[in-house]
Amino acid sequence: MTRDERIQRLIAASPTLANYRLQLIDKIVSAFAQPKDFRRSATSELITPGVLEDFGDVLRMHHCLSREPFSKDKFEYALERILIESGVVASLAPRGQRGFDIEISTEKFSLKTEAAKAIRENTIHISKFMELGGGTWGSNLEDLIGLRQQFLTALAGINRILILRTLKKSDPIFLYELVEIPKPQLLKASTGRLEMMMQSTQNPKPGYCYVEENEELLFSLYFDGGGERKLQVKGLQKSLCTVHATWQFELPTGTL
């Protein structure tokens, strides 16, 4: 369908729409006219100028209908559709697939989001990198070796890691950034310092893997022994990562 054909179809359909549907369309169109500042790294092969604009518009449309941050499932779907529209071969992983979330030009990507109220601009926290399934996990420090190996095995099945971070969500101004976490940095956990939190009342007991370099903490893995039994990545220095793009925008005030 050509651009003119699409415009004519919208014009023809407008008189048949109920008032609230017209309000929805009007708000979305109004959002696209608000101030915005979309930026991409000149070296990013993933976020082209077209992908930058299209993904930013999807974020703006989302916030016309919700105050909540863009969720992981929306991130996955939007990235796939926008890349395909731009001519890139992309496909979401089969439902239930562990490890990667999307394949882009033969590379397997893990997609994460971060949107905590206490988010820190210069350090990254992944509250659930993966679930920690079977294996021995009690109060023995050596149990953490097996849990760390689960993490390293998961990394072996992916090529790249992207995280969409919601840095500002103070309606009407929003700020998102897309950051790539270098896989080699995470692989440094293989020689990290392990510590079991023996004072914890949890069972199994939580533990840490501290990844340090020149007496500086680069990040830590947190083996969360709570109900979900999950692995967190804490305090990852953003300076070790690549910022592919940022999207800052305003939305029209008022309600639908």
Language-model region placement:
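Nucleic-acid endonuclease domains
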Residues: 1-100, 104, 112-256
